[in-house]
Amino acid sequence: MLGWFGIFGRSQEIQRLERALRAHGHHPALVMDAVKITTVKQLKAAAGGQTPDQNAIESAATLLAYCAMGREDFAENNGWSATAAVEDRIVAAFERGGTIDEKLVLLALTARMVHPSVRERFDLKAE
């Protein structure tokens, strides 16, 4: 995932995720490598073991950026319609259960990277 002992650099999937995070206004250095690696592994599992496509990477980055930045900062960088869309995704993820969105939000929560306003808004707790 991170290249062979770092000699060859980061994997293309990780690089794509980092670019997508940056495009949403969240610096990728603020996301732990373990979260990025696990995100890519979750996306691969959801794609039946195949390399995740760009849409899946973008979708995951949107969710992670929102969780980390909080509603206001995310909206400032991405607009209110994108903010409403990601909030709808979070609600739907926990209503359905077992979705990739739910897994990614729980990953962010476990990694302690969820903004306090997001934790409060969706009543998210890590136990």
Regions found by a protein language model. Name each.
Residues 6-53:
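Short terminal alpha-helical segments
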Residues 79-127:
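Amphipathic alpha-helical binding modules
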Residues 26-33, 46-55, 71-80, 94-104:
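Charged, low-complexity interaction regions
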Residues 6-9, 75, 123:
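Compositionally biased, low-structure terminal segments
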Residues 12-13, 74, 88:
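Amphipathic alpha-helical interaction segments
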